[in-house]
Every structure is written in structure tokens, then in C-alpha cells.
Amino acid sequence: MRTLWMALCALSRLWPGAQAGCAEAGRCCPGRDPACFARGWRLDRVYGTCFCDQACRFTGDCCFDYDRACPARPCFVGEWSPWSGCADQCKPTTRVRRRSVQQEPQNGGAPCPPLEERAGCLEYSTPQGQDCGHTYVPAFITTSAFNKERTRQATSPHWSTHTEDAGYCMEFKTESLTPHCALENWPLTRWMQYLREGYTVCVDCQPPAMNSVSLRCSGDGLDSDGNQTLHWQAIGNPRCQGTWKKVRRVDQCSCPAVHSFIFI
């Protein structure tokens, strides 16, 4: 049977009225195209109208030379561009990178991969160099008792004697917190139990948590107008977290010890 099929194909090339399929007709079409046909042998060994469109694979009416005349070619893309800057300054937004198509897919070849990627982004300064963006950074806090163990001498050589002591205190009113805070009972994490909704707490900003350039601590909420909900997270248990609102900035903290914390 195979010999007969090969013989018929050979005879079709000698028949004056016969075309050899897609190659001789010069046809290769994407998708389903009823006008993309030729005269010749089909893959199902029937002579007559055969097709050279991509859908012929599913309908079974391709010309016998479709695979050779119309090989599948995958999509090729170029390299990623560099990441763009943040779409906006001083607030959470996105950055983007793109790549272009070097060769479109043909004849059922692999489709193109994503041509654009986005990622979260937050810039901490304006184009003019003004410090910003701290409102959206969670405040990482721990008990003020940790300050007794932490040296006040910053490691950066840029710190002067004047800036070593240039700290400040932020007062916040707690709005919400997760139940995980109350579950802590280890000696070094028991301080989390004293975080309560509705209480005013003090958080001290001191070196080395204080940035040596901006002289601020991340997440201090200093730019907030007092109505904005800010986020905090306890160091030692990432599931102990919550929200608060800024009350004011003061030079020295004056809250009870159990409601006194420090920025990390």
C-alpha cells in the first residue's frame, strides 16, 4: 500500500494538470483560511483540493507537502530592556521592562512569551533629591529594652558627634493588631503582649536605625497628616503586626516602659 501511495505521488508530478501542493502553489497561511488551498494529494491520500493553512492539521485536509513547505517556526524575542524608573515618586507603584518580537510564530510554532513585566516599586526621593516615601514603609519595632544592649555609636564613619545624639521620638495611637501578638510568652518576645488597640505608644528613633543622610528611621510616618493609617511589624514575630496613626513627633519619649519601643 505504501508503495502504491509513493507511486501515485510520483505520477501526480508528471500529470500536466496536477500541482505538487503547498510548495508549488506558494501558499502557507495562518489560522483557518478557506482560500488557502491548492490542487494535489492530501495527507489522507485523496487527490483534489488540499489546504495549506494552519488549521488543516486539525481538519486532516493538508496537502501532502504541508510539513515540508510550511514548517512550524516559533516566536523569537529580544533581550529585556532595562527596568524603568518608578511610575510615580514617593508612593507604592510599579516599574516595567519590555522586550520586542524578533520573529512572529508561523505555521503553528510556539507562541510569543510575555513581552512586558511589571514589579512593585517605591522611590524614597524626588527628582530634586527631597526625601520622601517613608509613609508607605512598615515600621519595624522592638522593645525599648533592646536599646540598652544596642550601642548608640553608629558604625558609619559619616556620623559625627553631633548626629550621634540627634534622635527623636514618634507617638502613635494603635488602631489594630493581629492576635499573634498576645500569644508571645517567651522572655525576649513577651513585650508584644503589651501592644493594645487604642493605646498611645512611643517609638524612639536613634542611630544606627536612623539613616545617616536623611536623619530619619524607616516607617516613622513623619510625613503623615495624622489621618493616614500606617503599618508596623514586630521584630521577632513577623505575624505580630498591625496599624497605627501618627500622633506627634517629640524630642524625648515619655510613655510607660511597656508602651515604649524603638525603630529597627
Swiss-Prot record:
Signal peptide region: 1-20
Which UniProt key words apply to this protein?
Disulfide bond, Extracellular matrix, Glycoprotein, Secreted, Signal
Please give the SUPFAM superfamilies that the UniProt record associates with this protein.
Somatomedin B domain, TSP-1 type 1 repeat
InterPro entries on file: SBSPO, SBSPON_C, Somatomedin_B-like_dom_sf, Somatomedin_B_dom, TSP1_rpt, TSP1_rpt_sf, TSP1_spondin_dom
Query: Which tissues and organs express this gene's product?
Result: Detected in aorta extracellular matrix (at protein level).
Q: Where is the TSP type-1 domain?
A: 74-127
A Pfam family recorded for this sequence: TSP1_spondin
Q: Where is the SMB domain?
A: 24-75
For the keyword Disulfide bond, the answer is: yes
A Gene Ontology term for the protein's cellular component? extracellular region
Localization per record: Secreted, Extracellular space, Extracellular matrix
Tell me the disulfide pairings in this chain: C28-C36, C28-C52, C36-C70, C50-C52, C50-C63, C56-C62, C63-C70
Which residues are modified by glycosylation? N227
Question: Could you say which protein family the record assigns here?
Answer: Belongs to the thrombospondin family.
Q: Which PANTHER family match?
A: RPE-SPONDIN, SOMATOMEDIN-B AND THROMBOSPONDIN TYPE-1 DOMAIN-CONTAINING PROTEIN
The name this protein goes by in its record: Somatomedin-B and thrombospondin type-1 domain-containing protein
